[in-house]
Amino acid sequence: MGDVFRFLKQARRDGEKTPASVRKHEFLEIYALMDAAHAQEQADRCLGCGNPYCEWKCPVHNYIPNWLKLVAEGHLFEAAELSHQTNSLPEVCGRVCPQDRLCEGACTLNTDGFGEAVGGGPNVGGFGAVTIGQIERYISEEAFKAGWRPDMSNVVATGKKVAVIGAGPAGLGCADVLARNGVKPVVFDRYDEIGGLLTFGIPEFKMEKWVMTNRREVFEGMGIEFRLNTEIGKDVSMQALLDEYDAVFMGMGTYTYMKGGFPGEDLPGVLEALPFLISNVRKCLDLAKPDEIFHDMKGQRVVVLGGGDTAMDCNRTSIRQEAASVVCAYRRDEKNMPGSKREVGNAREEGVQFLWNRQPVEIVGDDKVEGVKLVTTELGPPDARGRRTPVVVPGSEEVIPADRVIVAFGFRPNPQPWFEQHQITTDAGGRVIANGQAHAFQTTHPKIFAGGDMVRGSDLVVTAVWEGREAAKGILAYLDLL
């Protein structure tokens, strides 16, 4: 970073994006990977702030200014090594993190004249945040292509082994840290590939599945063992794991969808978000089983209920399945929606119509979906979490036509029947209690640890990675290895 005024001479420039007219017909990633010159040019825009807000806004606290400097200077392998010190899945987070409200939203260059943070990209009065997410992706992918792999040469085997339940972000984060500290992780997952919802829930226009295939090869090279198509409580008992392993980590995510609690949710034509997305991914990957239902939106009038990233995935998948129309209804305004601004923008470009401040009160139809009854809302005072509460406007009911309705209100944990048998305590929402014990992320069973969505509730990939990594440190302390 030789020129501290580079940001004045060089504007923010994202990786090339496939035009909406092309990308809406294909399940391929829409952002091209930066080349070396582009990545170095953009990395050199970083100011190297003395108090880097980007680093603190990042849930895993990536050493962002440091690896940006290394990229700017052309030190790719060193940047990859540093990136992997804090993040087990940097090439994934570079793709799917909502950088506009995390690292890039906190970038000093991403402020207007009054210091108010603005979403990613160019903005009035500011200079445009450093392209942190795309550079993070560039570092790992180019380093892997050039032959870089995590350095395990100084790792000394401890003779300890830990069972990890779930090959999603939390489980992979935990296994990564354990392996780097000489503990043998054995990861169990019910699916036929690692990644959990990274593989089977996130559509390929956000992340193509070879990314996780490559990551699996990297992890196996580190000594991590995967036992797939194996469900705990069905194929292997929890007691067997407790008998064979020195500790157990649970990172099983959240898969039970949250209902809206209004009439008509059980009508034919109403779909849950995850089964819809999973069926599409499995079809794209040629993994669909003969008895598996594929939910096809071709020629249908689709209404998606919800405003998070899962709702955006449903919107954009429906577009690619050639739906006749796709309408997304959300009960707050665009500014207060939970999803990534980038994803909303991409969905809008691809033809999704948004109805803001609309709350569903009924799915209407005789024996099948015919429409959705909505009411208009206004934003009232903030709730306990600081979010403004939608207030219904009297007399504002309307019915919009629909052939299919996809419910994307979020997900909650699904406590397993064997939890009680093994003294695993959950709260009223079904989340595993993993605090207040002697070690980080230790459950009420001393040998069992947990992290990710099943502990905190449905959240980001990067928060699950962080909790898995922190839980691994708790396990190391429990095993007297710290």
Task: Describe each region flagged by the PLM.
Residues 2-32, 61-73, 83-84, 112-133, ...:
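Beta1-alpha1 glycine-rich phosphate/pyrophosphate-binding loop at the start
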Residues 221-242, 290-294, 357-403:
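A structured beta-alpha segment of the ubiquitous adenosine-cofactor-binding alpha/beta core
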